[in-house]
């Protein structure tokens, strides 16, 4: 769910998932049957604060990306459309990824578009960069879910990129549905 209203009681709405229920006359009316948890709920109190969201806008300066790679372990790039790297940033992304990949830096591609999610496979530049660096892609996860999950996983898996990537794609309470 994503917070869509600032002051209303019905502030949250489902994104890329059907509405589960509503409250009417003090009762919960479920649209989908209740599904019990597969495992007990766990709480993670130790998280990494070294995650940064970088929202691309037209004219974004490449040196910002260099600064973020220097100062954060994980950068979530919120890109345009299905999620790709603009030509103006491509050289910087390659340079920074080559420079930092051995030190366990994580780059995640997301989209600024709320519905349907990202798909880096649509355009050649997205295909290439995803393949070259085994980038993690957010697909249909909300930005809030992406950031929260990464904060937990960075603390758990640290520099083990493969383990972190595998855990990222493991579905938690329907947070990711369309990972390819």
What are these regions (language model features)?
Residues 1-82, 87-89, 171-180:
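Accessory alpha-helical/coil subdomains and C-terminal extensions
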Residues 82-180:
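C-terminal non-catalytic interaction/assembly regions of soluble proteins
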């Amino acid at each position: 769910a994503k917070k869509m209203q600032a002051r209303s009681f019905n502030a949250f709405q489902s994104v890329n998932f059907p509405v589960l229920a509503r409250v009417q006359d003090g009762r919960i009316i479920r649209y989908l049957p209740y599904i019990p948890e597969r495992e007990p709920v766990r709480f993670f109190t130790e998280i990494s604060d070294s995650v940064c969201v970088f929202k691309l806008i037209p004219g974004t300066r490449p040196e910002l990306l260099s600064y973020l790679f220097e100062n954060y372990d994980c950068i979530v790039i919120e890109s345009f459309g299905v999620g790709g790297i603009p030509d103006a940033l491509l050289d910087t992304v390659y340079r920074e990824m080559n420079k930092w990949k051995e030190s366990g830096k994580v780059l995640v591609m997301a989209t600024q578009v709320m519905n349907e999610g990202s798909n880096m496979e649509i355009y050649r530049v997205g295909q290439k960069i995803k393949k070259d660096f085994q980038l993690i892609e957010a697909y249909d996860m909300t930005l809030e879910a992406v950031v929260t999950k990464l904060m937990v996983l960075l603390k758990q898996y640290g520099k083990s990129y493969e383990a972190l990537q595998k855990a990222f794609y493991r579905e938690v309470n329907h947070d990711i549905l369309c990972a390819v």
